[in-house]
Amino acid sequence: MRTTIHKVITMMKGLIIVLKHAFQTPVTLRYPEEKRILPARSRGRHYLTKWNDGLERCVGCELCAIVCPAQAIYVKPAANEPGHIHSHGERYASDFQINMLRCIFCGYCEEACPTGAIVLSNQYELSAYTREDMIYTKDRLTEKTPGESGRDPSREI
C-alpha cells in the first residue's frame, strides 16, 4: 500500500513538471528562416580592412600570426616598392591566410594588430564543401563593403 502511494505521488510530480513546461514558449529557432541575434561583441568571420585612401591597413608585422594560439594565421611580408605602394608602412602583407578550420575565434589577432587591419565580425555562417575553401586568402579577407565587419573601417589610429 505504501509503495503504491509513493508511486502515485512520484508520477504526479513528474506530470506537474511536464505540464509546467508544456505551455512555455520554445527556446529553439527555425534556423535558416530565423536567425539568432548575437551580442554586439561576439566574434565570427575575419576581415582585412583598408584606409580611406584605399591602401591596406596591414603592414605585414606578423603580430597576429605570433599571438595566434592555434597558429591559424600565415603572413608573408614584402617591402613596399616606390612605384607600387600597398600600405602606409615600409612593408605590406604580400600573402595573408587564415585557416578557419584551426581558428578558435579568440580575438587575439584583432587585439594585437597595431593598425586595426584585422577585425572579427559577428557573421557565423562559415560552412564550405572542401577544406581548401576554409583557408581564407587575402582576396577573400579583404572587406568589400564598408561596415560589413561590424566596425567602422574609416577609424583612424
UniProtKB/Swiss-Prot annotation:
Subcellular location: Cell inner membrane
Topology term for the membrane: Peripheral membrane protein
Cofactor(s) needed: [4Fe-4S] cluster
A GO BP entry: aerobic respiration
One matching Pfam family: Fer4_7
Binding sites annotated in the UniProt record for [4Fe-4S] cluster 2: 68, 103, 106, 109
InterPro entries found in the cross-reference section: 4Fe4S_Fe-S-bd, 4Fe4S_Fe_S_CS, NADH_quinone_OxRdtase_chainI
EC number of this enzyme: 7.1.1.-
Protein name, per record: NADH-quinone oxidoreductase subunit I
Gene (UniProt): nuoI
